[in-house]
Amino acid sequence: MNINLVKENNVLTIALEGRLDTNTSPALEEEINNMDLDVKELVLDIKGLEYISSAGLRVILSAQKKMNKIGSMKVINVCDSIMEIFEITGFVDILVIE
């Protein structure tokens, strides 16, 4: 999985490519845990994400909980197959998806 970070002012955009699974989710979790304290909005751009496992969902849920305390989070560029997973798991009711 590739993780690209772009920070503009208080907005951190994390673009993901590849698979977010048991092997790769710790890298995303580390990036989120180590983000600057002044970040008030987190944008997860998952246009290039091909697959997400329960471990990946856990990291996204953890990020949402963290951002609820300090700002906001949204998920953008969600493909149909991952949107279906978000719908089945109820994540559509938890996340802001654009």
PLM feature segments, named:
Residues N2-I3, N34:
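Short leucine-rich amphipathic alpha-helices used at interfaces
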Residues V96-E98:
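Short acidic-hydrophobic, aromatic-tinged amphipathic segments that line or gate anion-handling sites
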Residues I3-L28:
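STAS-typified acidic loop motif
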Residues T22-I94:
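Amphipathic alpha-helical interaction surfaces in cytosolic regulatory modules
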